[in-house]
Structure formats: C-alpha cells, structure tokens
Amino acid sequence: MKIYVDADACPVKDVIIFEATKAKIPVTLVTSFSHYSNAEQPKSVETIYVDSGADAADYRIMQLAQKEDLIVTQDYGLASLALAKGCIVLHHKGYKYTNDNIEQLLQTRYLSAMVRKSGKRTKGPKPFTAEDKEKFRALFKSMIAL
C-alpha cells in the first residue's frame, strides 16, 4: 500500500504523515507549484509538484495510484475515478468514499453547480473542526492497519 494525498487544501497532512511514518507506509503529497514549500519531511514522504491548472493534481494521482493504494481527497471526481481503479479513498472529514455513496455525492455536486450556474447561491462546506480531525485520524489508522 502507498498513500497519495491531494495536498493543496488538505487539512490533515500532519495526521497522515505522522501515522503513515509510524506504520512505515510511504506517502506521496501531490500539490501545485503555487503551494511550494521548503518544509522538511520524513524520508518516507515524497512531494510531487504539478502545474496549477484545474485537476492537474488529480490526473497525476491517477497516473501513480494502483489497486489497493489509499488516496485522501475532498474531490468527488477524483474519488470516483480512484474507486473504479480499486483504491481506498478517504475524505479529510473522516469518512470513506464507497461505491454506495459516491453517486449521491456526485449528484449533489452537480445539482449545486446547476443552482450556482442559474445565479443562486449554495451553502459552502461546514468549517473543519478538531472533531473532524480526530474522526479522520481514527478512520485513517483503521485503514492502514488492514
């Protein structure tokens, strides 16, 4: 198992790196050049920089990921593609994407886009909380223990 992180806006990178390093599982952070960092990472963590274009990180993750790798993303489109490839996919708020829930998530995203396109406003995501982080940590630890 390898872990790939859609890292541009991921608020749980620290949890992923800490827990994966303890478990000796390699982590690849995929992020755009606009989020370049000189921060030192453990040797088991690789950072891949991609262009800032739409979905560039998603495409790179899909090129790298193999069946049974673990991907962390908040992007439903990437999650859908990764599930089809046989990957384990987690959201940073602490839930697992599955073939049972991805269709509903994609449908909700589509309907919200149509509402916005018509000029109306939609609610944004709720703020990320410490409880969300701990929920993610528990799920992540259970997934890498398999």
Swiss-Prot record:
Belongs to the UPF0178 family. InterPro entries: UPF0178 (IPR003791). This is UPF0178 protein BCA_3127. It comes from the Bacteria. The lineage of its organism: Bacteria, Bacillati, Bacillota, Bacilli, Bacillales.
